[in-house]
Design a protein with these regions (language model features):
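Phosphate-coordinating catalytic segments in nucleotide- and nucleic-acid-processing enzymes
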Residues: 1-11, 50-269, 333-380
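Phosphate-binding P-loop
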Residues: 21-27, 263-266, 294
Length: 380
């Protein structure tokens, strides 16, 4: 199999909970664990913000970051204990090319000046990439930092599957998102666009994936789009069911099936998946992880976050010798920021709060049944 460009490394400085944290990634599957608040989703969004191509509604990385983190102020993304003038910087390497974006925490504006590229009119619109959102009023009230993007690196369109199901919430969502303020982040909007866009042709071809058929078979029918209503349906031999009436776990399966059918997950692309286990019965996890591994074997780089032992163990059990899987553990540290450890061997991942908790359950069950600890010590 040819080697496709992939995300090789990442460094987060003063980015939300990260003070100065570095990652070295696998070209295959990158599984990320950590307790709540350790920054797993923030890590994915930091990469996606650069990876995501600009669009009419989200023209630059400044707008992308604010919509990904649902904030009007970029300074909210800067680590909270930094001082004015401190630098938020995200750097990475993709296909042996370096890229970066950065922002300063600025003092509160006192003259109403917006941020631009030197050609702005104080409106906050600016014309340079990475400045403003075109919605400033000259007050500078929400422009206490600005983001500058450099090292333009061409990347394949990424896919971000949020933990929140969106397959059942398609009716009118995109229109509403563009016309009123909705409290949904940009990943929810983006994935609906990919659900609705037709298949495209890519120079790298598509992913031949037998597990895709197995996932489709789990649904028991075909995913059908109704353009007039803006809704998806599951069409079976007995009729069709509105997606909101389909079980959420099956809608998650349907999301992956739809993305593959639309040819968005192709060799050389990147899949970011935030907690794939949400609303999914463990009985479905074997086929799901089989599909994830199949994608990685055909050149799709995968980043997934999880709180599930089943996800981790399925990756461990199903991996072939040639599979490239790396496990990351994030550990929150209020003073030094979130720290990371990584390994290619699931059994040696430390710290591993998921495995520790399952081990604790076993110990408690053993004590309840026998009155002794795992070492044979009498507890009662």
């Amino acid at each position: 199999m040819p080697e496709y460009p992939y995300h090789k490394s990442l460094r987060l400085q003063n980015f939300t909970v990260f003070k100065d944290t570095q990652f070295e990634f696998s070209p295959g599957v990158n599984a990320i664990i950590g307790e709540n608040g350790s920054g797993k989703t923030h890590l994915l969004k930091a990469m996606y913000a650069y990876n995501r191509p600009p669009s009419r509604d989200v023209p630059d990385i400044d707008a992308a970051l604010r919509q990904l983190f649902q904030t009007e102020r970029v300074s909210d993304i800067v680590r909270s204990d930094t001082k004015p003038g401190s630098l938020l910087e995200v750097t990475g390497n993709y296909g042996d090319q370096d890229w970066t974006y950065a922002a300063h925490r600025l003092p509160k504006a006192s003259n109403g000046a917006g941020f631009g590229d030197g050609s702005g009119d104080g409106s906050g619109s600016g014309s340079g990439a990475g400045f403003g959102d075109g919605a400033g009023d000259g007050s500078g009230a929400n422009r206490d930092a600005h983001v500058v993007k450099s090292g333009e690196v061409k990347m394949t369109q990424p896919v971000f599957i949020p933990s929140m199901d969106m397959m059942g919430h398609t009716k009118g969502f995109r229109e509403a998102y563009n016309s009123v303020v909705l409290d949904f982040d940009l990943t929810c909007y983006d994935i609906l666009n990919l659900f609705n866009l037709k298949s495209r042709v890519t120079a790298n071809g598509s992913v031949p994936d037998a597990s895709h058929s197995r996932l489709a078979n789990l649904l028991g029918g075909e995913i059908v789009a109704d353009d007039s209503s803006g809704r998806f349906f599951l069409k079976t031999a007995t009729g069709r069911t509105d997606m909101p009436m389909v079980a959420e776990g099956l809608r998650k399966i349907a999301s992956l099936v739809r993305l593959q059918s639309n040819n968005w997950l192709v060799p050389g692309s990147t899949l970011y998946w935030d907690e794939p286990e949400v609303n999914l019965n463990p009985i479905l996890m074997q086929v799901l992880i089989e599909s994830v591994l199949s994608l990685s074997r055909h050149g799709v780089q995968v980043f997934l976050t999880t709180h599930s032992y089943v996800v981790l163990k399925e990756l461990d059990l199903q991996a072939d010798d040639d599979d490239r899987i790396r496990f990351f553990s994030l550990q929150g540290n209020q003073k030094n920021g979130t720290e990371v450890s990584s390994t290619d061997d699931f059994t040696t991942l430390i710290p591993n709060s998921i495995l520790n908790e399952y081990s604790s359950l076993y110990d408690r069950d053993l004590t309840r049944s026998t009155g002794r600890s795992r070492t044979g010590e009498r507890i009662r």
